[in-house]
Amino acid sequence: MEDLTVEVRGSNGAFYKGFIKDVHEDSLTVVFENNWQPERQVPFNEVRMPPLPDIKKEITEGDEVEVYSRANDQEPCGWWLAKVRMMKGEFYVIEYAACDATYNEIVTFERLRPVNQNKSVTKNSFFKCTVDVPEDLRESCSNENVHKEFKKAVGACRVYFHAETNQLIILSASESTVKRVNILSDMHLRSIRTKLMLMSRNEEATKHLECTKQLASAFHEEFDVREDLMGLAIGTHGSNIQQARKVPGITAIELDEDSGTFRIYGESEEAVKKARSYLEFVEDFIQVPRNLVGKVIGKNGKVIQEIVDKSGVVRVRIEGDNETKLPREDGMVPFVFVGTKENIGNVQVLLEYHIAYLKEVEQLRMERLQIDEQLRQIGMGFRPSSRGTEKEKGYVTDESAASSVRGSRSYSGRGRGRRGPNYTSGYGTNSELSNTSETESERKEELSDWSLAGEDEREGRQQRDSRRRPGGRGRSGSAGRGRGGSRGGKSSISSVLKDPDSNPYSLLDNTESDQTADTDASDSHHNANRRRRSRRRRTDEDSSLMDGMTESDNASVNENGLDDSEQKPQRRNRSRRRRFRGQAEDRQPVTVADYISRAESQSRQRNLPKETLENGKKEKVKDVIEEHGPSEKVINGPRATSADRALKPQTTPTERNNASCQDGSKQEAILNGVS
């Protein structure tokens, strides 16, 4: 403001020092020194420029001078017009010309100056320029020190910011200043903006320095966060940092974005650690066995979602087989979790517990499978309960063991076979007698029949023998189901056992008397009696069939037209039947047709070699006794088939009686397997 100093004439004629603040059309806004008068507008004619400071002072007696003095104590000093009357050394006697009466005063040389020759200012004495200031720079432009270099560059007398118009005002006494202002104004504003930024950083640095000095003796922690997790650490709109700053005892939280480093300062260690728990986000992985991955995820991700919700982790990711970023163990799949350290610890506890639970469940399941496998290897073990549900019947147990618990009867399988070498049916009465009813002679006779049979027939017999049930459900032998009682006055095996000396062939008398020449007729009569009791359904789905193959000895072709050797024996239906019947009901009368083969068997016999026929004749007596005895349903021996009988020579009743008389004693001993 020194450059805009002017002298304003007062009402008493003295000139007082003032400063130009603004330039108007016909006046100037002047501010007085020390504000002894308020700011006011002064016309141009009452304002003049001060003299140059380097003017040479040469004062002699009689010269007009200006004296720096004041009229009273209330007014400041001003330049008054006076005249030198006397000089004596450095002291001057002056006389004021402004006063009506002469007023003399002795003053020193410093208070004197020559008369100011400058005239009053005019409109063209000052030049004014304005520059609009942006809003962000208005506060900075209010400080006149910011425009110091700009003022010097443009040659302005004064540069200041006008708050009402938001403009930068440049006042100058030179016209060239206006041109310079137009050139440098934009650059000046940019420099102000740059300086403002630097100044603000310096201020922050100063504050930080002061804060650091204060916190040097306090608690602080420093930790790094990965760049990809920095967004999670800061939070949405800095929510995590704000939450950490709200922790009681936290004085400052600093973040270095370049290195991802957090610095937390607080009054206590607990407060600092708590604030750190909000900001420290990490990524960690947990190894999960491959066979348990599906169970850890759960149906529709239910299990893993529950773990994530309870632990508080932000993300979960399953490492793929083609990814090799993380170390992988054999048979393990890494589960990658992202969250705070506390969240990672929570998810680790939950996941380890769940994996341990799944392993225990798997171990129990394997033990269950091992027990099941042992039960299968032992075979058909004890059933826990026959009333159990279908799911409880999944264990395979042995039916024979279960049947032994239920009763004395043995049901060893419901199919064909499953006959052990010591198999004994529970259907027979007096099973011990039934098992021992076969004598050595009968076995020899069966062996002889076996030797006479061909290879094909032997195989067929072996197959049938493997399916036979010794002592089970026979209708004609004594080893059957106790149905050999007499009926209608007919002879029975009991009469033979009571009187061993009697003729055993008396059992055949009733049957031979009813023979006829027509073999087919007797055959049909023989089968008619059996159909009454043999029409039984093999299974629930099959219709009733004639049990011709198993009930008759001379039936070589069954009712379906298939040879017995080619067809599998029908599966017997184990129906409940009365165990005790009359012996005569099951026992059938033996006729000549039982010992005479059909026409097919006769034609087959004619084609046999002579040696086979001769061997058959030698054994005819034994064959006859086997037909009348219980050999058809022997307990443990094979059953003769129609093919075996076809190989035997046919005999008449007379020849059979003669042969029986010759070996009567021998046959009596082996009749029905009882000696």
From Swiss-Prot:
Composition skew (Basic residues), residue ranges: 527-537, 570-581
Record Pfam families: Agenet, FXMRP1_C_core, FXR_C1, FXR_C3, KH_1, KH_9, Tudor_FRX1
Skewed-composition ranges (Basic and acidic residues): 608-631
Q: Where is this region: Disordered?
A: 381-675
Q: Where is the composition biased (Polar residues)?
A: 649-664
Task: Name the keywords, alphabetized.
Answer: Cytoplasm, Developmental protein, Differentiation, Myogenesis, Repeat, RNA-binding
Compositional bias (Gly residues) spans?
473-488
Where does this protein have compositionally biased stretches of type Low complexity?
403-413, 429-438
GO CC terms, sorted:
cytoplasm; cytoplasmic stress granule; intracellular membraneless organelle; neuron projection; nucleus; presynapse
Name its cellular compartments.
Cytoplasm, Cytoplasmic ribonucleoprotein granule; Cytoplasm, Stress granule; Cytoplasm
Give the Agenet-like domain ranges: 4-50, 63-115
User: What ranges does the record give for the region CC1 domain, renumbered to this chain?
Assistant: 201-208
Q: SUPFAM superfamilies per the record?
A: Eukaryotic type KH-domain (KH-domain type I)
Gene Ontology MF terms in the entry: molecular condensate scaffold activity; mRNA 3'-UTR AU-rich region binding; mRNA 3'-UTR binding; mRNA binding; protein heterodimerization activity; protein homodimerization activity; RNA binding; RNA strand annealing activity
Skewed-composition ranges (Acidic residues): 511-521
A Gene Ontology annotation in the biological process aspect, one of them, is: mRNA transport
Q: Would the keyword Signal turn up in this protein's UniProt record? A: no
Which residue ranges are recorded for the region named CC2 domain? 353-379
InterPro entries cross-referenced by the UniProt entry: Agenet-like_dom (IPR008395), FMR1 (IPR040148), FMR1-like_C_core (IPR022034), FMRP_KH0 (IPR040472), FXR1_C1 (IPR032172), FXR_C3 (IPR032177), KH_dom (IPR004087), KH_dom_type_1 (IPR004088)
Whether Repeat counts among this entry's keywords is yes
What segment(s) does the record annotate as region RNA-binding RGG-box?
470-485
Please state the protein's primary subcellular location.
cytoplasm
* Record comment regarding domains: Disordered region at the C-terminus undergoes liquid-liquid phase separation (LLPS) for the formation of a membraneless compartment that stores mRNAs. CC1 and CC2 domains are required for homodimerization and FXR1-network nucleation. CC domains also mediate interaction with other proteins containing similar CC domains.
What the record says about family reads: Belongs to the FMR1 family.
Protein name per Swiss-Prot or TrEMBL: RNA-binding protein fxr1-B
